[in-house]
Amino acid sequence: CFAVLLLEVQGQGMSAKVVALLGILVAMNAVLRFVESAVPGPGGFSPIFLLIVLGGYVYGARFGFLLGALTIFVSSILTGGMGPWLPYQMFTAGWTGMAAPLCRPLVRALRAEGKAGEAAVLALYGGLWGFLFGAVMNIWFWPFVSGPAGQYWEPGVAFFEGLRRYAVFYVVTSLAWDAMRMAGNVVFILAMGVPALRILRR
């Protein structure tokens, strides 16, 4: 997976400046995640999504995906957090950055470029991904655990029944945890979004 990401960086004609910036942002986020693992915040509260969201928003979907995926990979080396969950973390963090440019039309419609409204739109986006990140992450282990009937996957379960069971499982096991991630994303983007965007656009 890491080799594919490196080939993507080399094969897409990224300028040396953009590749260097990608490396710097990945390193910054990896250090933030290392600190986060040493001094954990409440629930899923994490500072790393600030740069993933803003980087993808400013530099595009490919840059955002690489920033998210490489952040998770490099930080997992620092924290020793490698396991079967790692590909899910990498792809989901990558998707968080990759989809960030979808906020651009709304920002333009609101004429909020460079203003607090731009950060507000991105904060709402980051908040949504606070929940989506956890919802995708749970899939790596949900089919392999067992518990109360009506919450877990079983062979032969119909598609919509599986969705219903997963929704119940998510609410019971993860909603409160992911709400902390959502809150962290919103707080960091609202507090630092405008100056951070200004720096990234230089």
Residue ranges of each PLM-predicted region?
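Lipid-exposed faces of alpha-helical membrane segments in multi-pass integral membrane proteins
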Residues: 2, 24, 28-31, 70, ...
